Amino acid sequence: MTRAVRIHQLKIAPKYFNAVVAGQKTAELRKDDRGYKVGDVLSLCEWKHGVFTGREWAAVISHVLPVNDVMAVSEQWVMLSIRPLTPLEALGYVIAGGAV
């Protein structure tokens, strides 16, 4: 049985947001407080000076690396490998239940 695609809405600073949109940023370091899984979608919402700019972009998680696997840290962090999706691709991905 397949699981439903989870969508995680996250705040992101403009310089990182722009790098994701341009395809230059393909990983995201995050505290693992949401149980991120391969196939989940990140809804990246650009925030500047504490205010949502209205810009949003999606990316699908292609790999989850627990940071504790490579270094000892006191909290649970993960390095998420991501593949940016256009808004239309993101919609199709979610509707298809994560099928590529």
UniProtKB/Swiss-Prot annotation:
Disulfide bonds: none annotated. The keyword Ligase does not apply. It comes from the Bacteria. InterPro entries: DUF3850 (IPR039440), PUA-like_sf (IPR015947). The keyword Transmembrane helix does not apply. Keywords: Transposable element. To phage P2 uncharacterized 12.9 kDa protein in gpA 3'region. This is Protein ORFd in retron Ec67.
